[in-house]
C-alpha cells in the first residue's frame, strides 16, 4: 500500500507562494500530488514551484478578488492536468489591529473581498470543475481560531473568518450530494507573511503564541497547519465534511472568552 496520501491527485493551493500555502505545496507534492500554485506574488510562487520541481508544481498568477481570473486559474488546472481533486483555499489578508472606534472600512472591504469573496469564487469554480468530471473532491479553507471567537484577531479579519466558516458549512450542505467534502482548518497565531514582515516580527509572533497558548513545549509552525490540511485533503478523512479542524493547541476550547 502506497504511503503517498495524495497519489495521483491534482490540487490548487491559493496563497501558495509563502507561509502555510508554500508548506502545503511541499507537503502535497511529497505525497504524490501535482499542484497549481495560485498567488499574485509571481517571483515567490515561481520559486516555490522550482524548489519542488516543475514536474510537480506549476504557478498561476491570480487576484482572488477577480472572479474571471479565478475561473481561468481553475480552467488552466483542468486543461493542464485533466481534472481537479483538491482545492486548498488558503489566500488571506489581515489588517493592522486597532480600536473598533477607528475601524477603517476600506480595509474592512478589502479583507472581506480576499478572505471571503475570493474563497467563495474558488469554491464555486473548483466545485463546477469537480462536478463536470464526476470527481468526489475535497475543498479545504484556511479559517482561524478567530472564526470561532472574538478577541485574538483584528476586527475585519475576525469578521471575515467567521463569514468564511459559514461559507464552509453552507458549501458542505450544498456540495455533499456531488460527493464533494468541504472543511476548514483553523490555526492559532502562526508566523507567516500575513502577520510577520521580518525575522524580528516572526520572533514576536512565536513568543506571543507560546506565551498565550494552552499547549506548552510546541511552537506552532506553518508546517503543522499544512499537515492538518493534508489530512482533510486526503482520503484519510473520506467521511469528514463541514468541520473546522482546530490547530490551536486547545486555545479555542479552554481559553476564557
Curated annotation (Swiss-Prot):
Induction: Accumulates upon Pseudomonas syringae infection and after treatment with systemic acquired resistance (SAR)-inducing chemicals, 1,2-benzisothiazol-3(2H)-one1,1-dioxide (BIT) and benzo-(1,2,3)thiadiazole-7-carbothioic acid S-methyl ester (BTH). Its EC number is 1.1.1.-. Highly expressed in the radicle tip, lateral root primordia and tips, and the area surrounding the cotyledon hydathode of young seedlings. It is an enzyme of class 1 (oxidoreductase). Disruption phenotype: No phenotype regarding abiotic stresses. Enhanced susceptibility to the incompatible pathogenic bacteria Pseudomonas syringae pv. tomato DC3000. Keywords: Hypersensitive response, Oxidoreductase, Plant defense. The active site is at 157 (proton acceptor). Substrate binds at residue 144. One of its GO terms (molecular function) is oxidoreductase activity. GO terms for biological process: defense response to bacterium; plant-type hypersensitive response. It comes from the Eukaryota. NAD(+) binds at residues 12-36. PANTHER family: SHORT-CHAIN DEHYDROGENASE REDUCTASE (PTHR42820), SHORT-CHAIN DEHYDROGENASE REDUCTASE 3A-RELATED (PTHR42820:SF15). Belongs to the short-chain dehydrogenases/reductases (SDR) family. Confers resistance to the incompatible pathogenic bacteria P.syringae pv. tomato DC3000 in a PR1-dependent manner. Seems not involved in abscisic acid (ABA) biosynthesis. This is Short-chain dehydrogenase reductase 3a. It comes from Arabidopsis thaliana.
